[in-house]
Amino acid sequence: MFDDRRSFITRAFLRAEFELDYRAFTDERDAELLRRLRGWDERPRLNETLAERAFTQTFFVDTWGYGDAGRSPREERTLIARFPVPGEGAGGGAGAADLALGWFRGRTNAIPQVLCEFKDIRSKLDAKQNRKGSTRSPVEQCLNYVRGARRGLFANEPVQPWWGLVTDMNEFRLYWWDRAPTEYIRFSIKREDLLSGEYDLLSGSEDARFDRYLFAKLFSREMLLSDAGRPLLLRLVERQWARGRKLEGEFYDR
C-alpha cells in the first residue's frame, strides 16, 4: 500500500491530479502489474547478486521503464548498476550505489538523479548495520550516496541528484533530498501483519488498485528524471504547495 503519513505529497492530492490518467489505467494493465507483484512475492530465494539482477529487471526495467546498457539504445540508457560515489564507502573510501538513475545516454560522467540502495527482506531499513567500517542504516547509506553525488555541484547544473530510493525488495521508500530523512513516499508489496494497514499491493480492493497505479507511476522514468529542470514529481509537489497556500488564503479572507 501507499503509506503517506510521512510523505511529501499526499494520496488525496495525487488522486485528484491523476484522475483522468487513472481512468485510462485498464484492468488488463492492472492485472499484468498484479501478476508481476505476486510473482515477485512468491519468488524462490536467490543469492544477493541474482536477486538484485532479477529485482532490477522486474521493477526498474519492466515496471518503471528505465533502460540499461545491455538492451536499450544509447539515447535511452537511464540505469547504471554499481555507480561509484567517491568518499561514501566504508571508512570514507570510495563507495558504490547499487543503482543510479539518470539520463546517462552512455556517459558515465552524467549527473545521476536517483541513487538506490538495495537490501534483502531480513534487513530493517532504519536499523544500524553490523558492517566493517560503517554501521550506517540502509536509509543513511542511501542518503549518503545522494549527498556524495551532490558534492562539488554548483546548483546551476541542468539537473541535480534529487532522490534516494531504498528498499528491502518488499518495502520501497523514495526520499527527496530537500525533505530527507523525515519525509518519504512509501509503498509495501505485502503487509508484515494485520496491524500494518487494511490492505497491500497484492489486495483486490479499489484502494489497492489505485495504489498499484501510483506504484507504477510515481517511480517511473517520466516522474523522477528530467533532461533539464525539476522533474515532474517535484513540479507536482510545488503544485500541491501552491494549492495549499491558495486554500489557506481563501480561508483567512472569509
Please annotate each region the language model reported.
Residues 47-52, 56, 92-96, 134-141:
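Phosphate/oxyanion-binding active-site loops and adjacent basic polyanion-contact surfaces
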Residues 41-80:
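Acidic-basic catalytic patches of nuclease active cores, encompassing PD-(D/E)XK
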